[in-house]
Amino acid sequence: MGGFSIWHWLIVLLIVVMVFGTKKLRNMGSDLGGAVKGFKDGMKDGGQSPADEKPVVPASQVTNAQAADKAERNTIDVEARQKS
């Protein structure tokens, strides 16, 4: 009564195949399989101990003096333009 019979599911499957086509469904299936495989590989790689990994060396840090010097070079003096 409240559940779906096998005939209901077969009709739904037939409609889905007619709407999307077999090629589109095959592509979606392979994409989904690749995503699941990538997820499993990521979970497997994430479980490695930190001792096995190489330490991350931070990129060169910009000091406040370097940032101020760069900002000063990029600043345009509006009053100097008006005086000329």
UniProtKB/Swiss-Prot annotation:
InterPro entries: TatA/B/E (IPR003369), TatA/E (IPR006312). Keywords: Cell inner membrane, Cell membrane, Membrane, Protein transport, Translocation, Transmembrane, Transmembrane helix, Transport. One of its GO terms (cellular component) is TAT protein transport complex. The chain crosses the membrane at residues 1-21. Residues 69-84 have a biased composition (Basic and acidic residues). The keyword Lipid metabolism does not apply. GO terms for biological process: protein transport by the Tat complex. One of its GO terms (molecular function) is protein transmembrane transporter activity. It is a single-pass membrane protein. Residues 40-84 are annotated as: Disordered. The keyword Protein transport applies. It is found in: Cell inner membrane. Belongs to the TatA/E family. The Tat system comprises two distinct complexes: a TatABC complex, containing multiple copies of TatA, TatB and TatC subunits, and a separate TatA complex, containing only TatA subunits. Substrates initially bind to the TatABC complex, which probably triggers association of the separate TatA complex to form the active translocon. Part of the twin-arginine translocation (Tat) system that transports large folded proteins containing a characteristic twin-arginine motif in their signal peptide across membranes. TatA could form the protein-conducting channel of the Tat system. This is Sec-independent protein translocase protein TatA. It comes from Polaromonas naphthalenivorans (strain CJ2). The lineage of its organism: Bacteria, Pseudomonadati, Pseudomonadota, Betaproteobacteria, Burkholderiales.
